[in-house]
């Protein structure tokens, strides 16, 4: 499987689960064969406001597995700036969350709530 120009090997991946897919868990999954891992759900706004916890959630480690950072939000400009900041940490790719139904995320228009606004979701991806 390929995501853009990144070749994914293996048949298993670690899903981006908040509170579960921390660095230690990603390292263990990579060690035991995950084709790629995705970091925890990270607030783009938190990253841009300088929140250290949010910045740490974006960190990738280098191993045999492909590592991705995941962002959520609803403001295209903030999402773009947070993605540019995430790129400085060298993830293999950046995942934009459009599936989280948690009130903390979707209740503020991010995650799965973006599926109600396809035009906005398109702007974020572009």
Name each model feature, range by range:
Residues 1-2, 17-92:
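Glycine-rich, positively charged N-terminal anion/phosphate-binding segment
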Residues 1-2, 6-12:
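Extreme N-terminal starter segment of soluble prokaryotic enzymes
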Residues 9-11, 64-68, 109:
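Short, solvent-exposed beta-strand edge segments and adjacent coil->beta transition regions
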Residues 13, 78, 82, 117-120, ...:
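General structural feature for long, well-ordered alpha-helical segments within catalytic domains
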Residues 13-14, 70-71, 113:
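A generic structural signal for short
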Residues 17, 99-101:
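Generic beta-structure capping elements
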Residues 45-57, 102-126:
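Active-site-adjacent beta->alpha loops and helix N-cap segments on the catalytic face
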Residues 72, 96-99:
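Well-ordered alpha/beta subsegment
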């Amino acid at each position: 499987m390929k995501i853009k120009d990144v070749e994914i090997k293996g048949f298993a991946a670690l899903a981006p689960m908040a509170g579960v897919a921390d660095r230690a868990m990603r390292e263990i999954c990579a060690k035991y064969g995950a084709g790629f891992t995705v970091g925890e759900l990270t607030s783009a706004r938190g990253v841009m406001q300088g929140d250290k916890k949010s910045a740490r959630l974006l960190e990738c480690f280098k191993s045999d597995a492909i590592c991705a950072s995941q962002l959520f939000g609803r403001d295209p400009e903030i999402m773009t700036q947070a993605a540019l900041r995430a790129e400085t940490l060298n993830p293999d790719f950046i995942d934009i969350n459009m599936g989280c139904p948690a009130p903390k995320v979707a209740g503020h228009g991010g995650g799965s709530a973006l599926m109600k606004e396809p035009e906005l979701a398109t702007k974020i991806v572009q």
